[in-house]
């Protein structure tokens, strides 16, 4: 980079002026420590900016550096606290695009704070003029730092015990239309879906407390629906009551009321609500024995562009640290963005104890979760009964499959729509347990089940031509 090299020597040895970032922050001989937090950035420097200088600038501007030397550097140990760009590699097939690896000392981050961690790593550097684009692809969170976080309130194993549901994915449905229903009609829709065979129903992400349906009324009618459906079916049911609110105080007031009326699970929009609010709510949920469903509303604004932003695998890791028992993760086969290998990479990062580096799935670092509970992935968005075999094969048992339009769009109503999905799921689980390959034989499995389930047969006929086949934006 071209700078005006104006420097002034003081008696103390301090040199004022501007110097290249790479002189301080590019350290290719550095060997990362087990306690370092590691980051992989996809970067495109401006013309004329060497990749070493750009990588060093990323390390500097996301840790201790600024655009000029400052005399207060002499008051601290810069080598102890600075971020270090320790490796840079070209991205195959891309012109002027590089993966830049940065190691951050653990002391740079407040314990147990995703908010502080992200403020440091991505808070300022993404607007740096020397970079045309920058994307945070992955983080390696050291075990020493993970141990300062509570993580999910309960996790997958505890949730299954609470619900007494084993050996299959959970089934859910988002109530539609997402806006405009009265609280009583909303509760009616919840009841019909749950009695039809679903485990959960869900508030949509933008249902909070609007004039047409205030939160307290919705909570009461939804809980009445849960209790009636449980009494009829003998199964434990739930509805994700969205407690996202304008302030943390109001959020906790809604959570307290949900617990008081007996709901087993509540919901939060973690990106629009913020990580501070989410961590607060996750800790409340563990103290109070309530499950926490997390919606990722706004994620595509941050993660969909390949060259700039933050990859969802990072947002998923941050959620596991901040706390949540469920997290929406795409479907691979539905209407929302999601290439299979990349999607399953971050799904494993959500629910497994240890995940090895696997660049083919976009996993840049080996991640040990140090016994932190896992997060159940939620597949939701444009799925219907014909997708069931693929969803069971792709996501396995430890997942929640949510059919919104694929339940409520059934010609005979909500309860038959729920029954169609439950029959399709049970048929796929039985076929899988018998050793059948659902990728090859899934269509036959659904057709066989439809012969003795009129509800499923009608759903199969309605959605037999519906596909969402578009090229994925998120590729390696």
From Swiss-Prot:
The modification N6-carboxylysine is found at residue 202. It catalyses: 2 (2R)-3-phosphoglycerate + 2 H(+) = D-ribulose 1,5-bisphosphate + CO2 + H2O; D-ribulose 1,5-bisphosphate + O2 = 2-phosphoglycolate + (2R)-3-phosphoglycerate + 2 H(+). It comes from Trichodesmium erythraeum (strain IMS101). Its cofactor is Mg(2+). The disulfide bond which can form in the large chain dimeric partners within the hexadecamer appears to be associated with oxidative stress and protein turnover. This is Ribulose bisphosphate carboxylase large chain. Gene3D superfamilies: Ribulose bisphosphate carboxylase, large subunit, C-terminal domain (3.20.20.110), RuBisCO large subunit, N-terminal domain (3.30.70.150). GO terms for cellular component: carboxysome. Pfam families: RuBisCO_large (PF00016), RuBisCO_large_N (PF02788). RuBisCO catalyzes two reactions: the carboxylation of D-ribulose 1,5-bisphosphate, the primary event in carbon dioxide fixation, as well as the oxidative fragmentation of the pentose substrate in the photorespiration process. Both reactions occur simultaneously and in competition at the same active site. GO terms for biological process: photorespiration; reductive pentose-phosphate cycle.
């Amino acid at each position: 980079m071209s700078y005006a090299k104006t420097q002034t020597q003081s008696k103390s040895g301090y040199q004022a002026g501007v110097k290249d970032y790479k002189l301080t922050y590019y350290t290719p001989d550095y060997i990362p420590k087990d306690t370092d937090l590691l980051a992989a950035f996809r970067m495109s420097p401006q013309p004329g900016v060497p990749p070493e200088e750009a990588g060093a600038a990323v390390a500097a501007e996301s840790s201790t550096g600024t655009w000029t030397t400052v005399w207060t550097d002499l008051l601290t140990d810069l080598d102890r606290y600075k971020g270090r760009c320790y490796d840079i590699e070209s991205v195959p097939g891309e012109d002027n695009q590089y993966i830049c690896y940065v190691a951050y000392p653990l002391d740079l981050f407040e314990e147990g704070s995703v908010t502080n961690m992200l403020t440091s790593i991505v808070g300022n550097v993404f607007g740096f003029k020397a970079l045309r684009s920058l994307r945070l692809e992955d983080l390696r969170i050291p075990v020493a730092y993970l141990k300062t976080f509570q993580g999910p309130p309960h996790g997958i194993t505890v949730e299954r015990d609470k619900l007494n549901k084993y050996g299959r994915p959970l089934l859910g449905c988002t109530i539609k239309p997402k806006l405009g229903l009265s609280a009583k009609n909303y509760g009616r829709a919840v009841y019909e879906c749950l009695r039809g065979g679903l485990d959960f129903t869900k508030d949509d992400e933008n249902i909070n407390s609007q004039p047409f349906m205030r939160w307290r009324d919705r909570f009461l009618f939804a809980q009445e629906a849960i209790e009636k459906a449980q009494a009829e079916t003998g199964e434990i049911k739930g509805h994700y009551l969205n407690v996202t609110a304008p302030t943390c105080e109001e959020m906790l007031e809604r959570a307290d009321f949900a617990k008081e009326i007996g709901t087993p699970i509540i919901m939060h929009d973690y990106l629009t609500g913020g990580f501070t609010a989410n961590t607060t709510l996750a800790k409340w949920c563990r103290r109070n024995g309530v499950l926490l469903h997390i919606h990722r509303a706004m994620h595509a604004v941050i993660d969909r562009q390949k060259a700039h932003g933050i990859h969802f695998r990072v947002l998923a890791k941050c959620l596991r640290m901040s706390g949540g028992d469920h997290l929406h993760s795409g479907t691979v086969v539905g209407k929302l963005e999601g290439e299979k290998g990349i999607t399953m990479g971050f799904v494993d990062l959500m629910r497994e104890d240890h995940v090895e580096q696997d660049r083919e799935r976009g996993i840049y670092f080996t991640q040990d979760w140090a016994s932190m509970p896992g997060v159940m992935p939620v597949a939701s968005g444009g799925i219907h009964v014909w997708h069931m075999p693929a969803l069971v094969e792709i996501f396995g048992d430890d997942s929640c499959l949510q059919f919104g339009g694929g339940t409520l769009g059934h010609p005979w109503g909500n309860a038959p729509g729920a029954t169609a999905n439950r029959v399709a799921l049970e048929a796929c689980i039985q076929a899988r347990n018998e050793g059948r390959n659902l990728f090859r034989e899934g269509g036959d499995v659904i057709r066989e089940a439809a012969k003795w389930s009129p509800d499923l047969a009608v759903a199969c006929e309605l959605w037999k031509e519906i596909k969402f086949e578009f090229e994925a934006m998120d590729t390696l």
